[in-house]
A protein has these predicted regions:
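Acidic/histidine-rich catalytic neighborhood of metal-dependent amide-processing enzymes
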Residues: 1-51, 90, 161-175
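Structural signature of cysteine-dependent C-C bond-forming condensing enzymes
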Residues: 15-24, 52-53, 59, 93, ...
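Short glycine-/aliphatic-rich beta-strand segments at the starts of folded cytosolic domains
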Residues: 42-44, 69-77
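Short amphipathic alpha-helix segments
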Residues: 46-59, 83-97, 163-178, 210-218
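Short beta-strand-to-loop capping motifs
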Residues: 48-50, 78-82, 114-116, 201-203
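Short, solvent-exposed loop/linker segments at the N-terminal edge
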Residues: 67-70, 191
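Self-splicing inteins and homing endonuclease
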Residues: 104-117
Length: 318
């Protein structure tokens, strides 16, 4: 499917299949007991120039594969006045329990990589952002101009700002919870006029993309802010809806566990229907390896989920 990159497959299906939109449905793409609410999902881009007028030079800074993932690692090429770079890097890595790599390009140019831990972009607190940690290290040196602004925003504002407090965009809804922010992709090239940091933001009902963008535009050092064309608004199916009640009843019968509604920052195909939810397949006692290296599930859990789905489908269509 195209679920991780744009959902164009479902757009095509609904447009060409020639059938009316289903009355209800569920997607087995999350966790039990149920996900009946999903926060809005947008990506905002912070734009910076390429002025590099400092005693230290930032030639490039890259990190992250997708906006909806915490960058596992980030790499920078730097030169100029970088006193005791190797020593500071080693001490920094030990202090924060990070892995790193450093190599020389020439006598005064270095390539540095900080290795953290990836996680799903809806739960950035579960990861270790290689990009913001690398910026935190480099921000100790005398960079100038846009390079300095780029590093300062990443190090002082974005680093561990999982709810957007330092960005000035924090918001909490009583039903859907707090906004979350993941600095997902970093791209700085001193030869390019436009350099960016991509922020994946999961927001509850009560705020909106324009309000969020207006807040980001106030961040010192940012030249401009742009919004990705792709995004989703908040989605919620009430707990007393027959679909939700039926699925929770089946879950309780099959597992002996109490069911309850949940709202997540992640996005599933469930939100494509007005009465759509996510239902499984991860169980509450399972270790979440989603979007991480060596992602896996136990075969026993697949059988448990299949039994739940079989009864759920029967109850919904009988």
């Amino acid at each position: 499917t195209d679920e991780e990159s744009g959902w164009q497959d479902m757009d095509y299906y609904f447009k060409h299949v020639g059938l009316p939109e289903p009355d209800f449905g569920f997607s087995p793409d999350a966790e039990f007991p149920i996900i009946n609410g999903e926060k809005g999902n947008i990506t905002e881009y912070l734009h910076f120039g390429n002025d590099n007028t400092g005693n230290a030079k930032l030639h490039s800074f890259t990190g992250g594969l997708r906006e909806n993932m915490v960058p596992e690692s980030a790499t920078a090429v730097v030169s100029g006045q970088l006193p005791d770079l190797a020593g500071l890097l080693d001490a920094f890595a030990k202090e924060h329990q990070l892995q790193y790599e450093i190599s020389t390009v020439d006598e005064e140019t270095y390539t540095i990589t900080i290795i953290g831990k990836s996680a799903h972009g809806s739960t950035p607190e579960d990861g270790i952002n290689g990009g913001t940690y690398l910026a935190l290290l480099l921000n100790q040196f005398d960079f100038g101009g846009d390079a300095k602004a780029y590093l300062q925003v990443a190090a002082r504002v974005l680093h561990e700002d999982f709810t957007g407090e330092k960005l000035g965009i924090a918001y909490t809804d009583a039903k859907m919870g707090a906004l979350s922010m993941n600095a997902g992709v970093f791209h700085f090239d001193s030869s390019k006029a436009d350099n960016t940091i991509a922020l994946n933001i999961r927001y509850p009902q009560g705020t909106d993309p324009k309000t969020i963008q207006a807040g980001l535009e106030k961040v010192t050092g940012v030249v401009s802010v742009s919004l990705s064309e792709h995004g989703h608004t908040p989605h919620y199916v009430p707990a007393d809806d027959e679909l939700v009640a039926t699925l929770l009843s089946v879950y309780e019968k099959q597992t002996g566990l109490k069911g309850h509604e949940q709202v997540i920052g992640g996005g599933t195909f469930g939100r494509l229907l007005k009465r759509g939810v996510a239902f499984g397949a991860m169980f509450p006692d399972y270790v979440n390896t989603m979007h991480q290296a060596n992602e896996f599930t136990d075969v026993e859990d697949l059988f448990r989920a299949a039994a739940i789905y079989a009864e759920a489908i029967y109850e919904l269509i009988k």
